[in-house]
Amino acid sequence: MNGSQAGAAAQAAWLSSCCNQSASPPEPPEGPRAVQAVVLGVLSLLVLCGVLFLGGGLLLRAQGLTALLTREQRASREPEPGSASGEDGDDDS
């Protein structure tokens, strides 16, 4: 019976060292956690750069459209060079 008790004790010791039998989940090793943090940081930077790139493109497009609209408004206010050659007095009355 001593042999079976020693075998049972050895098996229990092996199970407790091998398998986590407590309620807490096993903690992953630090190496994969560091790699995961680096990958997450790189992906965050890529997303930030993409947002800035797209935002900058939209800003440039908006500025271009604003400049085009301003040019068109100025052109519509100014009389065309060929049409207003002799009718200068009608605007001041």
From Swiss-Prot:
How is this protein annotated for GO cellular component?
Answer: membrane
Q: Where is the composition biased (Basic and acidic residues)?
A: 71-80
Compartments it resides in:
Membrane
UniProt keyword annotation of Signal present:
no
Q: Which UniProt keywords apply?
A: Membrane, Transmembrane, Transmembrane helix
Heme among keywords = no
Q: How does it sit in the membrane?
A: Single-pass membrane protein
Transmembrane intervals: 38-58
Question: Which InterPro entries does the annotation name?
Answer: Reprimo_fam
Task: Specify where the region named Disordered lies, as residue ranges.
Answer: 71-93
- Name of the protein in question: Small integral membrane protein 41
Origin species: Homo sapiens (Human)
Encoding gene per record: SMIM41
